């Protein structure tokens, strides 16, 4: 069972809770245990502040992943962590990349969920593994390959703040 806490702190239109639940369940499908996570939808001001605080980057990014650092046996429901998604950035990226809003949102949510499960894209091998899983999950939902038109290694990855900052 997925316990999802959707916090809306942005006035920019975003998908509904049912879509987020579907995308999270797909991204967390390999996890058999119950899971709890929070998705906070923010505007660019809050997105920039969080990215600056945790990553020392002075711009709003699409998705920040904050994995929980609490042993599962200390909680009734295993807390995976939090995703902070900057709504205007995700919507703008979809338009700039010629992707449907729904497909790009699904990609960002699944990408963030995979970070909460421990996947990363720091080196090429990890990135290839993570991207392959994203492609598979998105294809099962009927969405196109999010990396099909990429000619460089610069993908719209979400960012996971280092645990050194927690």
UniProtKB/Swiss-Prot annotation:
Its EC number is 3.1.-.-. Its main location: cytoplasm. InterPro entries: MetalPrtase_cat_dom_sf_prd, YbeY, YbeY_CS. It is found in: Cytoplasm. Binds 1 zinc ion. GO terms for biological process: rRNA processing. One of its GO terms (molecular function) is zinc ion binding. Zn(2+) binds at residues 111, 115, 121. Residues 141-166 are annotated as: Disordered. Keywords: Cytoplasm, Endonuclease, Hydrolase, Metal-binding, Nuclease, Ribosome biogenesis, rRNA processing, Zinc. The keyword rRNA processing applies. Residues 153-166 have a biased composition (Basic and acidic residues). It is an enzyme of class 3 (hydrolase). Its cofactor is Zn(2+). GO terms for cellular component: cytoplasm. Single strand-specific metallo-endoribonuclease involved in late-stage 70S ribosome quality control and in maturation of the 3' terminus of the 16S rRNA. Belongs to the endoribonuclease YbeY family. This is Endoribonuclease YbeY. It comes from Pseudomonas syringae pv. tomato (strain ATCC BAA-871 / DC3000).
């Amino acid at each position: 069972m997925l316990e999802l806490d959707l916090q809306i702190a942005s006035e920019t239109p975003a998908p509904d809770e049912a879509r987020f639940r579907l995308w999270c369940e797909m991204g967390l499908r390999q996890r058999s245990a119950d899971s709890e996570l929070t998705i906070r939808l923010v505007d660019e001001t809050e997105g920039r502040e969080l990215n600056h605080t945790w990553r020392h980057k002075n711009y709003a990014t699409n998705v920040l992943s904050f994995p929980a650092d609490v042993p599962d046996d200390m909680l009734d429901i295993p807390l995976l962590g939090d995703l902070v998604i900057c709504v205007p950035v995700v919507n703008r990226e979809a338009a700039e990349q010629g992707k449907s809003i729904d497909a790009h949102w699904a990609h960002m949510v699944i990408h963030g969920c995979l970070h909460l499960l421990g996947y990363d894209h720091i080196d090429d091998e990890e990135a290839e593994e993570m991207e392959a899983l994203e492609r598979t999950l998105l294809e099962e939902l009927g969405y196109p390959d999010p990396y099909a038109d990429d000619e460089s290694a610069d993908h719209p990855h979400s960012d996971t703040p280092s645990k050194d900052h927690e």
